């Protein structure tokens, strides 16, 4: 039995039936990691010894437990912008290269309460700014399906560990597509929950009105299992909402017959790669055979989503990243003559090029002469995008689009052209703007590379998108395919 090929749900069942010990599972994933990690480089910090130690502890606890939690003893990887107590949290930046938090993020506390085992901290674009994980200050992560290509970003490490079988599941964060785009590029399932569904406490902030933590898994069940644990109100995060959390796992089997799918014409234009379009529409046809109906809809203001996003997100980032000044924690420049020089040198040496670019864009958009023309206007357009989605959801239950305009691109292909890089999030950013939940699920291959289908739902209705994704998964075997690394 190759344990590293099992899904999180399958591993959970094996632990609950006591057929397999947590330590055996963790050992299998460490062995797999030792084989493929040198080629992929998905971990900033691998925690093999700690994981084994925790797993052996779980072995002993298992003998005494009557009610075994779903994630008990299961290995999960964590994106390195989520605070883990006593474990380095670098945000893949020189600025936080040696930063060790003194507290856990709420999502980590919730996973710990289930008895999960952390496998390590995964690589990302520095401070989650990027779409390829090439902006990591340490090294780029490679796509397990083709080592010459990017895994997507910013949660590229989290997607790559799951795709390559180094961990059965992981956590990422999504500000403009940072869970869904890498999930699509790596051929795994990734969910960005509704804004406010999962606590952001302990997530290093990039754009506070857009960021959300979410899970990656091999299957829809895996993602549902993690959502059951991490969702819900948190007194430490005032933006988290006290809307009841359903049992996502138990409701997966609900019949999707009669549900209406919206296909936004703005997403299926001439610019969309014809092969991608065909793969997505074939997937929709499969769902129609199951009793769902497809309808063309319009989301007129989404065509301004990228421009709006690249004003709002950098503006919030310029404010959030002001705290990294060399005074309290993180990197501090070695030589400086006065306080002002310490600030400027620390930030110049500590931040990478893309982070500096976004801080400058954001500072410009917020500056007194331009605030109304840029930031205020962008907020108004954001409201119109939100309204587009709300109008559409009066007519349909879910919206289906491609997750990305094309499959994973080559490493270095877009790094000198920020606009091209930004456009790889063209289909994902509007869901963040509208705060709605959205999931990417593998739905085919183009040139032997995975293609992702995005399923977008009503606010706080992750349940329906998971049900539609689960139905689609049951008709296909994409979740059972592994890259040859």
From Swiss-Prot:
Spell out the GO cellular component terms annotated for this protein, sorted alphabetically and separated by semicolons.
glutamyl-tRNA(Gln) amidotransferase complex
Assembly behavior: Heterotrimer of A, B and C subunits.
Write out the catalysed reaction.
L-glutamyl-tRNA(Gln) + L-glutamine + ATP + H2O = L-glutaminyl-tRNA(Gln) + L-glutamate + ADP + phosphate + H(+)
Q: Does the keyword Transferase feature in the UniProt annotation?
A: no
The EC number of this protein is 6.3.5.7
Q: Which GO terms describe its molecular function?
A: ATP binding; glutaminyl-tRNA synthase (glutamine-hydrolyzing) activity
- Key words, A-Z: ATP-binding, Ligase, Nucleotide-binding, Protein biosynthesis
Q: What is this protein called?
A: Glutamyl-tRNA(Gln) amidotransferase subunit A
